[in-house]
Curated annotation (Swiss-Prot):
Principal cellular location given in the protein's record: cytoplasm
Gene3D superfamilies linked to this entry: 3.30.2130.30, RNA methyltransferase domain (HRMD) like, Vaccinia Virus protein VP39
Source species of the chain: Xanthomonas campestris pv. campestris (strain ATCC 33913 / DSM 3586 / NCPPB 528 / LMG 568 / P 25)
Originating gene: rlmL
Name of protein: Ribosomal RNA large subunit methyltransferase K/L
Catalytic activity: guanosine(2445) in 23S rRNA + S-adenosyl-L-methionine = N(2)-methylguanosine(2445) in 23S rRNA + S-adenosyl-L-homocysteine + H(+); guanosine(2069) in 23S rRNA + S-adenosyl-L-methionine = N(2)-methylguanosine(2069) in 23S rRNA + S-adenosyl-L-homocysteine + H(+)
Role noted for this protein: Specifically methylates the guanine in position 2445 (m2G2445) and the guanine in position 2069 (m7G2069) of 23S rRNA.
EC identifiers of the protein: 2.1.1.173, 2.1.1.264
Domain of life: Bacteria
């Protein structure tokens, strides 16, 4: 069975690792959460033990939902008397996006109406609503016309541990605090005899969470006590009681062995009083020393090694002070130089102000605030002088830098909402700087940023010296804005090689970077060839096909590196078939499938000419993707011209559609003209090009065209 664990953005990979450690058979990170495979007991264990999850959602039903009537009908089909006992209360949380229903509260109300009406039709007592502490809390996820109704097994946000009685201004949520501690390596440091220090501890969230983590206390134990998280009738009470009994035994042993190596201080006496009160309620007051102290007055710790965790002030209510950050960095280097630090800063500029050299940097979200988590190990490694006497950008380079920053700000909300990690940030926005810049963020390891720069061929009338100068200015601007070294910038040119060669090889680094899109890990090669293995412009279309492929058969023609196949597989396609003439691309596709745990007989790879294969094939498919090249010539197949062959190709592809199936056809030939009359003889055809262009490609929306065909 599959269920979903939600979390704050930036915690997905940590949460996936945690859930696997808790016993889930599979956990795949996606936007703001993790798709998990496991039994109900695994989900209930996550409710009790997850330090990172926001909610654990157990699905009851999933259905197409184009409008409010479909939402009501889909919910009303469930036998709600089997889920909600007579006299029990109900509440619904709703999240909607990309759908005709735009108001979450209205969607929640329609679900309540459907549940109540269904129960009343059974002749049973009408359930009442309790938004604060319901017996059954439901969750609606309505995204792009697909609705999922789930039980919130934890009964609400899991960051509420049950110990917070007092707080200072803008407290840190407990699950985000757990992420800061885990990125700092606190569990290992404690096991090795290290200490824990927070010199700006506020109401004590980081230190209390650290103490409970060290004592092996289940996060949900105090929250629920002897109660159960949900009175959903499907909740396994016996299993829950077994989990709680085991957790209490571990709690007893861990608290008894808890060492007094945790220290916190803050300049605000009111915050320290709140921290002491919270620690008392959490049962860890004896293990934590709290005191009123300025950052600069921090004293040397007796432990030779340990971890510093800190969440300095930075949001709209708590003004960020760069001087305070600098004092923090100077003090840590003086007092605990060999310790490890994990600092949650408001942004990269504030992190930089500490003067510390970050070995790793992560993007996290504290509510709606985008933060930079820097990890320094050890603290005392001097940061490289950040261009102490920096070479100022030229006027032209500064123009490019300003445009890049403007575009980043423009795309910020869209990227955060959709979880976009690879995107086009610049595409000849300034005509004299004629290039495209794509950003690729590494999905694993240090989450490094790579830039892929494609220089467009300049007109012959422009002097070569000007072309080189402008390219240098563009590269300098990009490196400064994204803070990347030259070795992480891949430069390509679309000029043809000597002798009219096709896609020439640029470097021979053989460096593979794993990136993520639509919940799938993908291998890209940014340096060695013109193309990287991932066509970013098809991102929306791939997402649509992945959603529609769940439980269905997916065919990918001219599959290239198989990205669409992989995303369909990750989304739950019952089978995928990927066809391409290139053995190199098919191996790349196989590697991508294996990277996502999707290798196996149900994912078929076929090395063949796609058109010839189609005309000989007899199997049927529910979703077909056909993205042919404009031209192709090969010693192993007939020459291919998309304008000449598209009717024949589409006829053969439509013939392979199962009843109710859909074919998505796309190509990049800018002068392409669909023979609508010929195609109408065997298919219904609708151009959907505008719907397949994301904001980062709106500047040049004709980068591809796309159609939806049905038999």
């Amino acid at each position: 069975m599959k269920f979903f664990a939600s979390c704050a953005k930036g915690l997905e990979y940590l949460l996936a690792d945690e859930l696997l450690a808790l016993g889930a058979s599979k956990a795949t990170a996606t936007i703001s959460g993790v798709n998990v495979e496991g039994a109900l007991r695994d989900a209930q264990r996550a409710v009790l033990w997850s330090r990172l999850a926001s909610r654990v959602l157990w699905p009851l039903t999933e259905f197409d939902c184009p409008d409010e009537d479909a939402l009501y009908a889909g919910v009303a089909e469930l036998p709600w008397h089997e889920h909600l006992s007579t006299g029990h209360t109900l509440s619904v949380d709703a999240h909607v996006s990309g759908t005709a229903i735009t108001h979450a509260r209205y969607a929640a109300q329609r679900i309540k109406d459907a549940v109540v009406d269904t129960i009343r039709r059974q002749g049973l007592e009408r359930p009442s609503v309790d938004v604060e502490s319901p017996d059954l809390r439901l969750n609606l996820s309505l995204r792009k016309g697909r609705a999922t109704i789930s039980v919130d097994l934890g009964g609400g946000p899991l960051h509420r541990r049950g110990w917070r009685m007092a707080q200072n201004e803008a407290p840190l949520k407990e699950n985000l605090a757990a992420a800061v501690l885990l990125r700092a390596g606190w569990p290992r440091a404690y096991a090795d005899g290290g200490g824990l220090l927070d010199p700006m501890c506020g109401s004590g969230t980081l230190l209390i969470e650290g103490a409970l983590m060290a004592a092996d206390v289940a996060p949900g134990l105090q929250r629920y006590g002897s109660d159960i998280p949900s009175r959903w009738r499907g909740f396994d009470r016996d299993s829950w009681q077994q989990l709680v009994t085991e957790a209490r035994e571990r709690d007893s042993v861990g608290r008894a062995a808890l060492k007094q190596v945790i220290h916190g201080s803050d300049m605000d006496p009111h915050a320290i009083r709140a921290a002491k009160e919270n620690a008392q309620v959490a049962g860890v007051a004896e293990a934590i020393w709290f005191g009123v102290r300025e950052v600069g007055d921090l004293q040397t710790r007796p432990q030779a090694t340990g971890v510093v965790v800190c969440n300095p002030p930075y949001d709209e209510r708590l003004a960020a002070d760069a001087a305070l950050y600098r004092k923090l960095g100077d003090t840590l280097q003086r007092v605990v130089p060999q310790w490890r630090a994990s600092l949650l800063c408001g942004n990269a500029e504030l992190a930089y102000a500490t003067g510390l050299r970050a070995g790793k940097k992560y993007q996290l979200f504290n509510g709606a605030i985008e933060c930079a988590l820097i990890v320094c190990d050890p603290i005392a490694v001097p940061r490289r002088t950040p261009l102490a006497a920096p070479t100022a950008l030229s006027e032209g380079a500064q123009m490019v830098a300003n445009r890049l920053r403007k575009n980043l700000q423009k795309f910020k909300k869209w990227r955060a909402r959709e979880g976009i990690e690879c995107f086009r940030v610049y595409d000849a926005d300034l005509p004299e700087y004629s290039a495209a810049i794509d950003v690729y963020q590494q999905a694993d390891g240090d989450r490094r940023i790579f830039l892929h720069v494609q220089e467009y061929a300049a007109p012959a009338t422009i002097p070569e010296a000007d072309v080189r100068r402008r390219l240098g200015e563009l590269l300098a601007a990009a490196r400064e804005v994204f803070e990347v070294p030259a070795e992480r910038v891949a430069l390509k040119s679309r000029e043809r090689g000597k002798g009219g060669s096709k896609y020439g090889r640029f470097e021979q680094r053989n460096e593979i970077v794993n990136v993520r899109e639509h919940g799938a890990l993908l291998r890209v090669n940014l340096f060695d060839y013109l193309d990287t293995g991932l066509f970013l412009d098809h991102r929306p279309l791939r997402g649509t096909m992945a959603q529609q492929s769940k439980g269905r058969r997916f065919l990918n023609l001219f599959c290239y590196t198989g990205v669409a196949s992989v995303q369909a597989a990750v989304a739950g396609a019952s089978a995928t078939t990927s066809v391409d003439l290139s053995g190199t691309y098919l191996q790349w596709c196989a590697d991508n499938l294996a990277l996502n745990g999707q290798a196996g007989s149900k994912h078929k790879l076929v090395q063949a000419d796609a058109l010839a294969w189609l005309e000989a094939e007899r199997a049927h498919f529910d979703v077909i993707f056909c993205d042919p090249p404009t031209f192709s010539n090969s010693a192993r197949a007939e020459d291919f011209d998309i304008q000449r062959e598209h009717v024949r190709l589409l006829r053969a592809a439509v013939a392979r559609l199962a009843p109710g199936g859909v074919l998505y056809f796309s190509n990049n030939f800018r002068r392409f003209k669909l023979d609508e009359e010929a195609v109408s003889e065997f298919a219904q055809c609708e151009e959907i090009s505008p719907r397949t262009i994301d904001p980062d490609f709106e500047r040049h929306a004709r980068i591809h065209r796309a159609w939806r065909l049905t038999a």
